[in-house]
UniProtKB/Swiss-Prot annotation:
Domain EamA: 113-231
UniProt keyword Membrane, yes or no: yes
Lineage of the organism: Eukaryota, Viridiplantae, Streptophyta, Embryophyta, Tracheophyta
Pfam families attached to this UniProt entry: TPT
Organism: Arabidopsis thaliana
GO CC annotations on file: chloroplast; chloroplast membrane; plant-type vacuole
Protein name in UniProt: Glucose-6-phosphate/phosphate translocator 2, chloroplastic
Amino acid sequence: MLSSIKPSSSSFSTAISGSVRRSIPTKLKFSPLLIIKNCHNQSFNANVVSHQKPLHISSASNFKREVKVEAYEADRSRPLDINIELPDEQSAQKLKIGIYFATWWALNVVFNIYNKKVLNAFPYPWLTSTLSLACGSLMMLVSWATRIADAPKTDLEFWKTLFPVAVAHTIGHVAATVSMSKVAVSFTHIIKSGEPAFSVLVSRFFMGETFPLPVYLSLLPIIGGCALAAITELNFNITGFMGAMISNLAFVFRNIFSKKGMKGKSVSGMNYYACLSMMSLVILTPFSIAVEGPQMWAAGWQNAVSQVGPNFVWWVVAQSVFYHLYNQVSYMSLDQISPLTFSIGNTMKRISVIVASIIIFHTPIQPVNALGAAIAIFGTFLYSQAKQ
């Protein structure tokens, strides 16, 4: 049944009786009438249209409400940021990350091998640590001078913020080198796999952070595995053990200081690590001279050269160069991947170092010791998953 339409103030009407007389507006823009079939027959059944109610048709031009539709050209001065990666770009990114990881692990394994060779012949970890930082600093200065890499733009505020990070990095670096000079490389890295436990404890009691229950539960295999590996280590040394533990604690504080102080800074990646190495070198040099001194270095150097031969010099150069390269690649990788992926990669790196050092140095290891190492590393993997 068709109902009447209320007209506007200037509308017109047509009465319907028996037959329909229609007055079509001169300019019809819109009609609310339903489409009726058989338009050729202009008569309507009386049962369809009410006899009493007239049908009013009004021109759309008389309606008070109008809709204005306009089109605007997009502002080309501000392009849309649509982050859509094509399949080729995704494949290239995955390949790039894979190359970073493979290079990172390979460089780290080579560094640990040469570092242990140097420390076996030249047991002076303070000088060895200093040479590693000095070599990296020199390499980056040459890269900046020759424009192989763009020099970072820094100011005094940047170096002030970097100072506590450099102090923690220096302590962690020296402590790890002291540990490797006293115990096997594999044992040092097994203990260093317990770094997540230090991270949670420091963040909880010093920074006031809280973590979900799975994070705390993941610490149990880490702590238990490290303890099992320590008590079953055949060549256990308290200095080597404490050096690895101090290194864990120092690197945790380094990460905290870096996260809080360096957030939003323009320097990142390899330039950030280069600046960190230079400041750490300035901090470490006077302490190295005070703890060991040139006289001990000269006597130890002559003894190492007489035992090893000229290859000893190349060992020192190799361990210094590869130390900087593997750290540089790790910082470059962190710019390309998520913290979770980096943490998993770091766990796999530690496994490769432990296995390679056992094979190359023929490190004696008991089954229960290997079980402790496996439990600790597996706990590190669980921690990286639970942290997310």
